[in-house]
Amino acid sequence: MPPPPHQKPENVLKRAHELIGVNQAPAALTLLHEHITSKRSRNVPIASLEPVMLLLVELSVEQKKGKLAKDALYQYKNIAQNTNVATIELVLKKFIELAAEKVTAAQAKADEVQSSIEATTSNIDDLEASETPESILLATVSGEQSRDRTDRAIVTPWLKFLWEAYRTVLDILRNNARLEVLYQSTAMQAFDFCLKYTRKTEFRRLCELLRNHVQTAAKYSAQMHAINLNDPDTLQRHLETRFQQLNVAVELELWQEAFRSVEDIHTLLSLSKRPAKNVMMANYYEKLTRIFLVGENYLFHAAAWARYYNLLRQSAALIASGHSKKADNPACSDADLQRAATFVILSALSIPVISTSRSRGAMVDFDEARKNKNSRLTHLLGMAQAPTRAGLFRDALSKSLLRRAQPQIRDLYNILEVDFHPLSICQKISPILAEIGADAEMQKYILPLQQVILTRLFQQLSQVYETVDLEFVESLAQFPEPFQVTRGTIEKFIMNGNKKGDLAIRMDHATGVLSFDADVFSSAKAVHAGSSAGSAESETGSVQRLQSTPSQIVRSQLTRLAEALYTTCRYIDPSFNEARIKARDEALARAKAGAEKEHQEVLARKEIIQTRKDKASEAQAQKEKENARKKLLQEQALQQAEAARLAEEQKLREAKRLANEREQIKRKEVEALLKDMKLEELQGEDIETLDSNKIRMIKLQQLEREKNSVAEKLRITGKRLDHLERAFRKEEAKKLPEDYAKQRERDLAAYERTKAQTLKEAELKHKADVELKHRLTRLMPFYESFRSDLHERRRDEFEKRRRDAEREMEKQINARRKEAREKRIREKREREERERQLREAEERAAREKEEERKRLEARREELQRLKEEKEKEREKLREIAARQQQREEEAMARRKAEKEKLAATPSAYRPPAAAERTEAAAPPRIALAGNRPSWREREAAKAASGETAAPAPAAAEPVAERPRAAAPPAERTEAAAPPRLALAGNRPSWREREAAKAASGGGNAAAVPERSAPPLRAAAPQRAGSGRPENDRDVPPAEPLKASGAPGKYVPKWRREGA
């Protein structure tokens, strides 16, 4: 069955509206979907497809047909992406807007349902009376109509549809540079959707989807319209999207996704060639602080706060110097800097002194994993090396952060790091902890601060006491409510420190005593391994030394002995000091020389590195520029080819459409014409068979009939109107005098009223004018005096202004004169310059013309000289030709004389001597193939053969008809005819051999006729003109020839037949 004919989009749209009008929306949606996905729709203009697509999107949203909409949108994108991107954006935006409107409507409907349920519940008067066993059972089985159930039934399906719409649109727009802006805006809308409706699962899927799109961008970078992450604008848009993703992840408290978003941002920042804005980086570090705080990674949390504070300082400096806009930088007022400095100090103080991880840090696998993780976090913060607790404090003190921090934080630092006293620590720190606990942001640091305080407490107690009561420790670790530390917390802290090897404390639960490690030979760790949550510091570096423990004394006795011996030698032996000082001076000199040399080498190496970096960057830039140029050219070529193809297809479609429209218009005109004519005889006839003549005749007949009908109607109507008009006038004549009298009375009354009103108004106006005149007459003297006084006062000012105006005019006149004079001078200079340039151009043209004339003259002289030389050569050639001709004439005369002598007295063949065959003026000619005689030789041969054959009749003397063939070799070897050389393959014929035998004295020499002589090869073409018969070889001679008697010789045919 053949496919159905393809319909136009306008007809499809009309049909869809008709189906919608009869409540057939699913059928309309199916019709539109089939039309869009049809292969024939690819050649339809986009302007006609756009309304179809908008209606399809609207119907698919109404009916929740997401898959149909997705299929149609993909097809529409493939059709329109190379011609019109705006229509794709319009359709996709419409799709998202309709889905969002449906979600909003569903939310409003759910609110209405819930409010009606609550109202119904509140209208019950007696709640106890309404509780029946049946209602209790029904409520138990079906459950209450709660808000969650209402949302699941009404809102959730539309939320799911909206989420699928976002996914569909993002998948359609991915990795297309022309649709990139809409892609980023849609991603932003999807983030807002997840944040507004708290869709955590969908947010994770959305992040993964965007991550996959970026990964596949490099894979399909060679495709047309692919995105280029090396483009700064594209990378900036991706960074903005990732920062929004990070913000939403933090708001939704999805810390794992937030950390992955941070890694994505760091990857994009490493690709970017332009630095990110400070406001974006401030947001980046601020979100990192929250992520690290939730993960209890206090070390990197403090490092992130330090980076945030440094960024605020840089932004404040840039804004103060005016090198950057305020909009590109975060808020960096004094309050913001104080807050950042406070949190830097507080977060650094919260870093644990010992490890708080439950895993053993001494294990190799855990150490390696920890190092890798710390390295990743260090790179995320943009730091050269991993941060430490001591390093953060040194950096904070060097930047005077304590002065910017809040006073209670400064006191807390002094108590914990400067003047730590275990017996009074809790009394001093309790008010500060209370203030910190009152602040919601600082309250999160109380628990790590307690861990730090307990660590300091146990480390210093271990230096003083060997055993201590647990109750005493509890009394020392008294914190304000609600931050009180219990015995269980202390025991847990001690067990964790012992497990990690950071503490050496034994607990006796029976007596409640804590015993510190007193083994003098125990090997305590000098530096403990840190964990991912903090960094352990050395005992000497972070804990105040109150007194040395016995184990420390035992471990340091050799060191102390060496120091005592060294001091003794230095005081007893003066030469020891001299040698030591001399060695130190020599070492200093060597170090100074080596430092200078190393400095120069470092500078040279730095210059080399910089030069190589510059060359590499230039090469990379050139390569990128070349790649971009090639890609641009390729894209332009593809676009031109695609545009040409589309233009050609559009042209063909337009021509076909116009032809169809002309045909339809013609058919409709014929149908309308026939319908207007109302011709009964043509109803059954095919319209296509009607020609213009027939239609014209039918039309003329119809017009004639209509004309006659109209004329008849006009005649009847005119006659009727004449009768009516005559009757009207007869009746009117009776009433005209009465009507005329009434009209005259009305006109006279109106005239009298108008006249009286006019006179009254004129009198009133005259009275008012007279009164005004009298009032003004009384004022005239005062007016005249005031005017004269005013003129007197203003005259001086007027004169002054007039003089100023005249001076200003004079100044302007002078300025204009000066300007005109300068203009004339400038024009004169320009005119002289132009004349000079014109004169130089004329002189240059004259020089060039003279040089050209000289070149032509020299060329003519050269041509004249060559012509004279050619003329001389031709003269020489003519002389040579004349001498040659003379020699030929002499040779011809000799040959003629010899022929006449031979014809008169025939004699035996005798070969000429070598001297006769070689002339001085004729070089030897080799008788090779193609070495034919010249035209002069042929003409001479013709003349000679003609002269010889003329006196002899053809029938009487057949032998004499071939004098040229019988001529001896001496006649054929003149000056113009070179002799034949005895070359390889050029053997003599039998005739030549016979003639040679006869000349050498053979017995049969006299019997050989002239015919036995070899023919002249050069005269072969003139054989037909020599008077010889065509087949004279078969004709017997006039005289019988005798056999030579030699065996194996040639016998002529006639001789063989005669025998």
Swiss-Prot record:
Similarity comment: Belongs to the eIF-3 subunit A family.
Matches recorded under SMART domains: PINT
Subunit structure: Component of the eukaryotic translation initiation factor 3 (eIF-3) complex.
Subcellular location as annotated: Cytoplasm
Biased composition (Low complexity): 908-927, 942-958, 965-988, 1005-1024
Entries under Pfam families matching the protein: eIF3a_PCI_TPR-like, PCI
Chain residue ranges for the region called Disordered: 794-1059
Keywords from the named record: Coiled coil, Cytoplasm, Initiation factor, Protein biosynthesis, RNA-binding
One of the GO BP terms on file: formation of cytoplasmic translation initiation complex
Organism of derivation: Neurospora crassa (strain ATCC 24698 / 74-OR23-1A / CBS 708.71 / DSM 1257 / FGSC 987)
Biological classification of the source: Eukaryota, Fungi, Dikarya, Ascomycota, Pezizomycotina
Superkingdom: Eukaryota
Protein name: Eukaryotic translation initiation factor 3 subunit A
PROSITE patterns linked to this entry: PCI (PS50250)
UniProt feature coiled coil, ranges: 99-130, 586-905
Sequence ranges of Basic and acidic residues compositional bias: 794-902
Biological function: RNA-binding component of the eukaryotic translation initiation factor 3 (eIF-3) complex, which is involved in protein synthesis of a specialized repertoire of mRNAs and, together with other initiation factors, stimulates binding of mRNA and methionyl-tRNAi to the 40S ribosome. The eIF-3 complex specifically targets and initiates translation of a subset of mRNAs involved in cell proliferation.
Ranges of residues in domain PCI: 337-521
GO molecular function, one term: translation initiation factor activity
Gene, per the UniProt record: eif3a
Cellular compartments per GO CC: cytoplasmic stress granule; eukaryotic 43S preinitiation complex; eukaryotic 48S preinitiation complex; eukaryotic translation initiation factor 3 complex, eIF3e; eukaryotic translation initiation factor 3 complex, eIF3m; multi-eIF complex
Keyword Cell inner membrane belongs to the record: no
